[in-house]
Amino acid sequence: MNITVLAVGTKMPRWVDEAVAEYAKRFGRDAAYALKEIKPEKRGAGVNAVQGMAAEEKRILEAIPQGAFLVVLDERGKAPTSVELAEHLKSWRQNGEHVCFVIGGADGMTDRLKQQARMMMRLSSLTLPHGMVRVLLTEQLYRAVSILHNHPYHRE
């Protein structure tokens, strides 16, 4: 199973990179995990939020693996349990889907990009910093994969 996370933003704190790398390493042969950073559009000097999101959308669309099942993280998305996320991964794996999760920029994502997604998901009702979202998403994806492989990492 191939899992790609596209995250708008660069230059995360070291603890974010280290935590993501730790969970990514734990996937082992159970899933191929990749995090790709998308350059954020600079705001100000004549570039407003709408223009910035449009520029980021273009970069995101170029980075989505061809034919991938697109999941965008959005505050209005569904918040699955860890077991439900594992069931989604199981279904995508059985269908041979490459799954691509998108974490938008500071201003979010365009409506057009959200409409292209086959699923909208949220990690929490709280507003979270982007670095924390990277870590939480990667950990939850690892947890879901570990559930599918009956690994003792997840406990009910």
Swiss-Prot record:
InterPro entries: Alpha/beta_knot_MTases (IPR029028), RlmH-like (IPR003742), tRNA_m1G_MTases_N (IPR029026). One of its GO terms (molecular function) is rRNA (pseudouridine-N3-)-methyltransferase activity. Its EC number is 2.1.1.177. S-adenosyl-L-methionine binds at residues 73, 104, 123-128. Belongs to the RNA methyltransferase RlmH family. The keyword Kinase does not apply. PANTHER family: METHYLTRANSFERASE (PTHR33603), RIBOSOMAL RNA LARGE SUBUNIT METHYLTRANSFERASE H (PTHR33603:SF1). The keyword Phosphoprotein does not apply. Specifically methylates the pseudouridine at position 1915 (m3Psi1915) in 23S rRNA. It is found in: Cytoplasm. GO terms for cellular component: cytoplasm. It comes from the Bacteria. Keywords: Cytoplasm, Methyltransferase, rRNA processing, S-adenosyl-L-methionine, Transferase. Homodimer. This is Ribosomal RNA large subunit methyltransferase H. Gene3D superfamilies: 3.40.1280.10. Signal peptide: none annotated. It catalyses: pseudouridine(1915) in 23S rRNA + S-adenosyl-L-methionine = N(3)-methylpseudouridine(1915) in 23S rRNA + S-adenosyl-L-homocysteine + H(+). SUPFAM superfamilies: alpha/beta knot.
